[in-house]
Regions:
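Short alpha-helical transmembrane segments in multi-pass integral membrane proteins
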Residues: 1-24, 81-148, 190-245, 301-366, ...
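N-terminal transmembrane alpha-helices
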Residues: 11-43, 47-48, 64-76, 80, ...
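Transmembrane helical elements of multi-pass membrane transporters/channels
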Residues: 22-41, 142, 153, 176, ...
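Helix-terminus/linker motif at the lipid-water interface of multi-pass membrane proteins
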Residues: 32, 36-54, 123-130, 186-193, ...
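Residue-level hotspots within pore-lining transmembrane alpha-helices
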Residues: 33, 37, 66, 70, ...
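Small-residue-rich hydrophobic transmembrane alpha-helices
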Residues: 53-113, 150-169, 275-339, 370-389
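Hydrophobic transmembrane alpha-helices of multi-pass small-molecule transporters
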Residues: 65-68, 112, 180-185, 209-214, ...
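Short runs within selected transmembrane alpha-helices of multi-pass transporters and secretion channels
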Residues: 74, 143-161, 169-177, 198-211, ...
Length: 445
């Protein structure tokens, strides 16, 4: 970790092969442990029955919805902060930190209230079937209570990370996630709260993360959050939109696509929903490493863009992309060999495993392409190329996935549901390549 005064020199001059791992490792750890919020719920609830597993899977899109807003405010304010620190304009960075945090907190409180008021229609919208509706509502009602804490935690996390203080960001998120995993068996089995206990453990972890991150934002070398700095203006909101809308597109469309996936899989019963939701969690865990690597690249990208060090920025992008691709190739090979065991680890049900194995193997075929897509999206987002960043963010889970999930099951049945993500990944990669060629031509040293 480097103090605020040292971050500029470190991010703009130190060797790339040292800077990115230094920034990425805490972020990867944070991303992996954050994934345990939902992985742990799936694992422990999976010990109950298939219906409980499906109910938790149905609420899964809500996590993406909350992340969409948290990343919108976090990346929107954080990317601006990193550019302003790179340009040595610290006052602007301080005001943006307060604007991003408080707007995120107030938005979370508003959405939580709306969700609780419209609980029943929300459960149906998420894709619940009549057989699991009571379980879905039970899990959902508690999960909504954590919305303002998760959203504002993600905002703080990304602000700290994009200042170059990834270790602080990691500690706050990891502590809450570890607490969640520890509390899951206590609430689910010992107190016999079942799916509601899983949600309660998650909310407690989110509250703890929020408190720690807020406290750490006031440590020396970080930009503290103060009410006196909160003065949102149209230029500030516009900067948040430019920097955060790609994250909103990416996570928001992931929410929509997962709901459509639940509805499509529901045609073949609760086992199909459970199988597809388990595959979603496995790939989410793998992608957490690649996203963490990309987020380790972002502070360097933002500082170098602000300092006009474009050649260094491009070299860092290539380093990030190559490392991410190699990692995904290795993981995809191992996942293909042990696909049955991976699915059965979460729910040892023959129907669930049958659906999950086929879907997982299809996704693993195109997973290595995701490293290029992710690093490209983060570069265009951090370098204030909002329309290109939004196009890349929307491609994988929206532009191509949504038509695929609406059309392919009609032609191929359940197989159409299982292959949708692979088709979308391939088409999104084809779009990414020319966008990056054009962007690199603009970034001339």
């Amino acid at each position: 970790m480097h103090g605020g005064k040292d971050n500029y020199t470190y991010l703009t001059t130190a060797p790339i092969r040292r800077v990115i791992p230094t920034m990425a490792v805490p972020t990867i750890v944070g991303m992996l442990v954050t994934s345990l919020y939902v992985i742990a719920d799936t694992f422990f609830v999976g010990q109950l029955d298939t219906q409980s597993t499906a109910a938790v899977g149905v609420v899964f899109p809500l996590m993406f919805f909350m992340q969409a807003f948290g990343f919108f405010f976090g990346h929107g304010s954080g990317n601006y902060i990193s550019r302003e620190l790179g340009a040595r304009r610290h006052g602007n960075a301080r005001r943006m930190a307060a604007d991003g945090f408080f707007l995120s907190l107030f938005t979370g409180l508003t959405l939580m209230t709306l969700g609780l008021v419209f609980l029943h229609p929300l459960a149906l919208l998420l894709g619940s079937t009549p057989t699991i509706l009571p379980l879905t509502e039970s899990y959902l009602s508690v999960s909504l209570l954590g919305m303002p804490f998760l959203m504002s935690s993600l905002t703080l996390n990304n602000q700290l990370r994009l200042q170059g203080n990834a270790a602080y960001a990691m500690v706050g998120i990891v502590t809450g996630a570890v607490l969640n995993v520890a509390l899951d068996p206590f609430f689910i089995f010992l107190l016999d709260l079942k799916v509601q206990g899983a949600a309660l453990a998650t909310v407690i972890g989110q509250v703890v993360s929020f408190l720690l991150l807020f406290r750490m934002s006031h440590h020396e070398g970080n930009i503290g959050i103060y009410w006196r700095d909160f003065a949102p203006s149209w230029p500030a909101v516009k900067e948040i939109f430019y920097g955060g809308s790609p994250s909103m597109s990416r996570q928001g469309l992931l929410c929509v696509s997962t709901m459509l996936l639940n509805h499509a899989a529901g045609t073949w019963g609760d086992a199909a929903i459970a199988g597809m939701s388990i595959v979603g969690r496995i790939t989410m865990l793998v992608m957490a490493v690649v996203i963490g690597l990309g987020q380790g690249f972002q502070p360097l990208c933002g500082f170098c863009y602000g300092a006009k060090l474009y050649s260094r920025l491009k070299r860092a992008w290539w380093f990030t992309t190559i490392v991410g691709t190699v990692f995904l190739l290795v993981v995809s090979g191992l996942g293909w060999l042990f696909s049955s065991e991976l699915i059965a680890l979460f729910r040892d049900d023959m129907e669930v495993v049958a659906v999950g194995v086929v879907a997982l193997r299809w996704q693993l075929l195109t997973l290595p392409l995701c490293a290029t897509m992710m690093s490209s999206n983060m570069l265009t987002q951090t370098c204030r190329k909002p329309w290109r960043a939004n196009l890349l963010a929307a491609s994988r889970n929206g532009l191509f996935f949504i038509p695929s999930i609406l059309v392919l099951p009609c032609w191929l049945g359940l197989t159409g549901v299982e292959v949708c993500q692979s088709v979308s990944d391939l088409l999104a990669f084809i779009v990414t390549v020319p966008v990056m060629v054009y962007t690199f031509r603009e970034l001339r040293a």
